[in-house]
C-alpha cells in the first residue's frame, strides 16, 4: 500500500497495467481539515476517491478499480460509524451514509465496491441501493 498524489497514482497504475496487474484498490487518505463528525466528504462527488476513479478510467480505461466503503477515513474521531453523545454507534444512520458513499463511487466509475466497515447489515443495504438506484453515466 502506497500513499500517492493523483499524478503519482496515474503513473503507478499505468506501470501496474504494463506489468499485467488488472485491478487496483483505492483507499483514501484525506486532509484532516475535511474530516467531520458525519464523514460527509465520503460522498462528495468532487472528492479524492471519485476524482481519482474518473482520472484513472480516462488514463487507464481497462484497469478495474475497487474502492473501499467505510466512514473512518472521513470522520474526525476515526470511528467506522456515527457516534451519539453517549458513545454508542448509530448503525442505521451510518448505513445511510455508506450507501451514499458507495453510490458516489459507482457513479464515478468504480468496478467493485468493497465495504470494510463493521456496520451490521451494510452489505445488503449497499447492494440493494446499487441495484435499485440507477447510477448516472460515467464522465
What does each model-found stretch correspond to?
Residues 14-17, 106:
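Non-catalytic positions within long, well-ordered alpha-helices that form the structural scaffold/packing
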Residues 39-67, 123-134:
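Alpha-helix-loop-beta-strand connector modules within alpha/beta enzyme cores
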Residues 9, 68, 105, 126:
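Conserved, mostly hydrophobic/aromatic
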